[in-house]
Every structure is written in C-alpha cells, then in structure tokens.
Amino acid sequence: MTPISVILVTDNKLTRPKTMSTTREKLLRTTSRFVSTFGSFDIEEILSIRTPTCLYHQCCPSFNKNVVTNEETRANFPQFIATFKRFDFSIIEPDHTLVDEAARRVMIRAKASAESIVGAYENEYIFILKMTDDCRFIEEIYEFYDTIRLKDLQYRLEAKHISYGDAAPFKTRDTQL
C-alpha cells in the first residue's frame, strides 16, 4: 500500500519539500481550478473540470442529501444564481490540505463568504475530491458543511416567502421538517 502524502505545517520549522511529484502538482492544480470555479456563476466553467459521470455527494444527513449528477447540478444552478449576488470561496489553512497521490484524492477545508438576496451567508466546508488517473478532472466530490448555517439561510429565505422548490439545493421547512 502506498502511503498517503501529507504535509502539515504547524510551525515555522516545517517547510514544504523543494520538489513536488508531478502527480501531486497535478492534483493540487485541479483542486485550485475547483476552488476558483466554485463562485464563478458560470455553470459551464464549474462543470468543465468534472468528468461527464462525476457524482457530487452532499454528505449532510439532516438535509437528506443524496448524490447529485452533473445534469442535476445544471438544473439547480439557476436557483443558486437567483439566490446569491456574490459567492466567494477559498481554502482555509492551505498547508493542511491532504493529498493521497495513489488514490488520486485531495481533501481541503474551505469557507464561503457570500451575499444572498436575504443578507450575508458564511459557511465552512470539507471537500474530498477524487480525480481521474491523469489528475485533470474530478470524478467524485464529497462535501461536508455546517448545516446550522445553511438552515439559517433557509429560514431567512422562507421568512421572505422565497420558495426554492423541491429541485433546489435544499427544501423548504414545509417539506423538510
């Protein structure tokens, strides 16, 4: 079994290796593209780094999330851009990014800072990205996030009588609770 390549920088005494493997560089480059497209408001750009069969696992049981396909992402996207005026997305503590070269996986901790039609929205995430063998595309995305913060946004939308509908990224209180 190939060991997982992990670089954790906890103080100034530890530094990155002077040379990174080509696989590691490719994985991190694709991860960087994922992060930069996340808040782009361009569905073609967002999907361009995914394989046609990419599966997006939203791993928050309290929202009854299932696996989302590219087609479902495309169908739900108009509701996303109607809800958010701005969506900034970035990696928290990049030095804590985990890279498993053999499995072609990268784990990042990220944050969103956004302006929605009902005010500010912030959240934190953990993403695990499974890449293709050539490391250029994402085959699977596993997303974990703070459900309390998302529920707060949901309740604020409902208070303004803004319906997201069943196909939206989350359901209204009437259909969820």
UniProtKB/Swiss-Prot annotation:
<comment type="function">
    <text>Part of the gene cluster B that mediates the biosynthesis of austinol and dehydroaustinol, two fungal meroterpenoids. The first step of the pathway is the synthesis of 3,5-dimethylorsellinic acid by the polyketide synthase ausA. 3,5-dimethylorsellinic acid is then prenylated by the polyprenyl transferase ausN. Further epoxidation by the FAD-dependent monooxygenase ausM and cyclization by the probable terpene cyclase ausL lead to the formation of protoaustinoid A.</text>
</comment>
<dbReference type="InterPro" id="IPR050977">
    <property type="entry name" value="Fungal_Meroterpenoid_Isomerase"/>
</dbReference>
<protein>
    <recommendedName>
        <fullName>Austinoid biosynthesis clusters protein F</fullName>
    </recommendedName>
</protein>
<dbReference type="GO" id="GO:0016114">
    <property type="term" value="P:terpenoid biosynthetic process"/>
</dbReference>
<dbReference type="InterPro" id="IPR032710">
    <property type="entry name" value="NTF2-like_dom_sf"/>
</dbReference>
<comment type="subunit">
    <text>Homodimer.</text>
</comment>
<comment type="pathway">
    <text>Secondary metabolite biosynthesis; terpenoid biosynthesis.</text>
</comment>
<comment type="similarity">
    <text>Belongs to the trt14 isomerase family.</text>
</comment>
